[in-house]
């Protein structure tokens, strides 16, 4: 969860950051980006004078350290298992051939979308071999994009309660470039991993009343692998649509249930795109009912204005930054906003990349240099090698065990919690600052949207998330923005009446502030997170 120096655990603004911050402090250890930048020189001649100046400034940040790393991720070492290993293989080319009669008696494809290049491999996992939720059905496998040599790993857990009727949820971590298996084992999955690298049962798992799919995406993240790369959110959305279409084709019993997409951090980019991709297909077997975004990065123009307030004592916790630093951030904000506005207007990497780098250095870098955890303003960064959390190291060690990789059918030679090359790819393609929040009004016309935020997070803080939801232009904006935050209390157990946060809602739009939660609310406040999750799936706010 460190900002990675460009990546966040669950990531979001972390990705481009650490390296950024390190560049300012120790240039020799800074981001090695000049290789792609040098390749841009001819293209720079075609840009406006202002744009050229921005790129010149970016290059000056890393004068000597830019030739050491490629911008594209290297392929992972892997060994593909034979088809005989898998219980089922769903061929997208076969699904593509299925035609049905519509209400008017006309022939049409049963499932829309370009699926012919995709296959889905499925294996029923043996929970007893892993010691993880042994009483629930589990499936693991890969989505294969055969035309582009891409292979996405997923892990499905059936609901502990009533799988024939409970909803299905897709969970996504962020980064970009961080594995969703981190969310599985550190936040909301059926087990966590302790210091002895052993699974520990989680009473507050989100599969208590829902079946959950954890997906390692984009490619080359976690157990996923590829000979090619994905470097923007829109491209990743095509893969997710294919996976869900083929998964629900194989398991029609789950396709009958309500389906929701949830995620955190950079999933604030992913989810508006992925949900829009699904809803764009008229004939689909994905029963999408809502989306949930936790501590997300969605509207940089609005959210970057709240780093100074959060770090300087205006977010409900004591100040981390001194007055001089706070003033410096105030002075940097107008230029940052101007650069993001230019990115929003052009959506060009030539404009969006400098905006990301300048704003992250100016508004996230000062906080990082304090040594405080960017994911939790209350604590120091305890383990820089694992994005501030020792638990992430435990998860990586567990998922790198040969017996675990064998049990889940993983095909890669090793597991990494975050792939920083992917992080850089997204950054240098301008994806970081693009205005994906503009897709949210279209979602609100069709499905409910929940934005929730742990109030101790810095990197994707609750102030910025509340602000962008109130600034969003949609038919219900006035009523939503004027709605007051109300107490959110536990209703479902012996702690009934306990205040766990605040909530405001109008129409299909809801915002929640969760008390005492950092960037990863389910990890910090497991009881509160399961409370609001179950009530949201039950339709309380929509």
UniProtKB/Swiss-Prot annotation:
Designated name of the protein: Carboxypeptidase Y homolog A
Q: Which of this chain's residues carry glycans?
A: 209, 508
The similarity comment for this entry is:
Belongs to the peptidase S10 family.
- The organism's lineage? Eukaryota, Fungi, Dikarya, Ascomycota, Pezizomycotina
Listed disulfide bonds for this chain? 178-418, 312-326, 336-359, 343-352, 381-388
Q: Which GO terms describe its biological process?
A: proteolysis
Query: Which residues are responsible for catalysis?
Result: 265, 457, 519
State the organism of origin: Aspergillus flavus (strain ATCC 200026 / FGSC A1120 / IAM 13836 / NRRL 3357 / JCM 12722 / SRRC 167)
> What residues make up the propeptide removed on maturation?
18-123
Q: Where is this chain primarily localised?
A: other
UniProt GO MF annotations: serine-type carboxypeptidase activity
